[in-house]
């Protein structure tokens, strides 16, 4: 069988399975997710063994420490995948929900009911936990899912998908409901993007190159999980202890994820005190600073920033730092360089916080909190499918409702149109 035929068959099986999934009861779907969670925990040793193969290959390829961290599975992360599935099982099922009914003058009643999208294709890189997270959300929302992970995580993804498919089979549900493209051949992505007869939506998660390739080559609608150029702005009257804590957490806790801070903006009236302070703290934690001229003056040893630094998603212990004239300048900078992911203001000035919330147009805007909270699980959505930076049809962390659409339902008593 050619690669083209293989991908087409895989997508067709997912489409066939989606018709069954759309009718599966909430109880069965919840049992499925809980069973998958138990199965992942039971397979921890085997999953870590397969993940070790990917980590070794990654080291041989020279992947950065941050990228290896994204790739790594340990007991805690496998437990986290299982916990995420259990949390999704506890969430309300959106399928079948009627969102409003109204009566027309002729007596007919019109409403809208949530239904699954059908088949969702997820194309992602590095993080093998996406395999379980995406499967859980898609299946709970009544959708079949076709997964294509990065070649660097192929052993981990195959192992996770195998565990999850085993639970589908045990409950008598169609195996085609969860499909993994098992080849590392990049041509498989191109073929997947041609399956408009069988796949309803593509969600790419990864670097800028992947997102651009998918957007330019897909025949299927795409929701972009674009790069996370997340900004934090420290206002003139910010609590500096709070600002330090937020900035350190946003940059250092997990620098290789999309909700890590990549650019720090500091009000000029706070700069004399805060720039040396945060530079010292971050430097001790191994962060390389790339700053404007004023930052370099206040924090000797800072690397002078170039234009490309302001729009960079480093995914590493590197931070762009700029001193700005005030809130107007901070907002203008963010509007120019933002990827519409997450932006933060640290301030004790209520009017400034409200203006920041109104004028910043990113999918998540925060006041006095770390950008690391920009996550579906942290928002109570359960494990997320991604953080959409596309305003249609979803914006921000995507949960169950974002994997459904609505159809109109009409009740009559024999009315005909005059």
Curated annotation (Swiss-Prot):
NCBIfam families: PRK00197.1 (NF001221), proA (TIGR00407). Pathway: Amino-acid biosynthesis; L-proline biosynthesis; L-glutamate 5-semialdehyde from L-glutamate: step 2/2. Gene3D superfamilies: Aldehyde Dehydrogenase, Chain A, domain 1, Aldehyde Dehydrogenase, Chain A, domain 2. It is an enzyme of class 1 (oxidoreductase). Its main location: cytoplasm. One of its GO terms (cellular component) is cytoplasm. Its EC number is 1.2.1.41. Catalyzes the NADPH-dependent reduction of L-glutamate 5-phosphate into L-glutamate 5-semialdehyde and phosphate. The product spontaneously undergoes cyclization to form 1-pyrroline-5-carboxylate. It is found in: Cytoplasm. Belongs to the gamma-glutamyl phosphate reductase family. GO terms for biological process: L-proline biosynthetic process. Pfam families: Aldedh. Keywords: Amino-acid biosynthesis, Cytoplasm, NADP, Oxidoreductase, Proline biosynthesis. The keyword Mitochondrion does not apply. The keyword NADP applies. It catalyses: L-glutamate 5-semialdehyde + phosphate + NADP(+) = L-glutamyl 5-phosphate + NADPH + H(+). GO terms for molecular function: glutamate-5-semialdehyde dehydrogenase activity; NADP binding. This is Gamma-glutamyl phosphate reductase.
């Amino acid at each position: 069988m050619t690669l083209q035929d293989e991908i087409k068959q895989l997508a067709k099986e997912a489409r066939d399975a989606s018709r069954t999934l759309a009718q599966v009861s909430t109880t069965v779907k919840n049992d499925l997710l809980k069973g998958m969670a138990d199965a992942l925990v039971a397979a921890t040793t085997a999953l870590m063994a397969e993940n070790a193969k990917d980590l070794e290959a990654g080291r041989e390829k020279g992947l950065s420490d941050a990228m290896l961290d994204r790739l790594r599975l340990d007991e805690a992360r496998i437990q986290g995948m299982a916990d995420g599935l259990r949390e999704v099982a506890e969430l309300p099922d959106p399928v079948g929900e009627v969102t409003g009914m109204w009566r027309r003058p002729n007596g007919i009643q019109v409403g809208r009911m949530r239904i699954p999208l059908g088949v969702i294709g997820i194309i992602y890189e590095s993080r093998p936990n996406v395999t379980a997270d995406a499967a859980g959300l898609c299946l709970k929302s009544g959708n079949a899912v076709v997964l294509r992970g990065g070649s660097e995580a192929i052993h981990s993804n195959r192992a996770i998908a195998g565990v999850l498919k085993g639970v589908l089979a045990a409950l008598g549900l169609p195996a085609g409901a969860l499909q993994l493209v098992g080849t590392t051949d990049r041509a498989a992505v191109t073929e997947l993007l041609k399956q408009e007869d069988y796949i309803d939506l593509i969600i790419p998660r990864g670097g800028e190159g992947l997102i651009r390739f998918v957007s330019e080559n897909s025949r299927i609608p795409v929701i972009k999980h674009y790069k996370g150029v997340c900004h934090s702005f420290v206002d003139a009257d910010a609590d500096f202890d709070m600002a330090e804590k937020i900035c350190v957490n946003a940059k250092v806790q997990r620098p290789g994820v999309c909700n890590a801070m990549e650019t720090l903006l500091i009000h000029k009236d706070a700069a004399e005190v805060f720039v040396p302070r945060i530079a010292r703290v971050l430097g001790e934690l191994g962060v390389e600073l790339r700053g404007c001229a004023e930052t370099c003056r206040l924090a000797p040893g800072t690397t002078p920033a170039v234009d490309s630094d302001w729009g960079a998603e480093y995914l590493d212990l590197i931070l762009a730092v700029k001193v700005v004239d005030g809130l107007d300048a901070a907002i203008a900078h963010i509007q120019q360089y933002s990827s519409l992911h997450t932006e933060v203001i640290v301030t004790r000035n209520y009017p400034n916080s409200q203006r920041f919330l109104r004028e910043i147009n990113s999918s998540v805007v925060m006041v006095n909190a770390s950008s690391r909270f920009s996550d579906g699980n942290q928002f109570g959505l359960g494990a997320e499918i991604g953080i959409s930076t596309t305003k249609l049809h979803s914006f921000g962390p995507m949960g169950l409702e974002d994997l459904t659409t609505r159809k109109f339902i009409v009740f009559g008593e024999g009315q005909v149109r005059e």
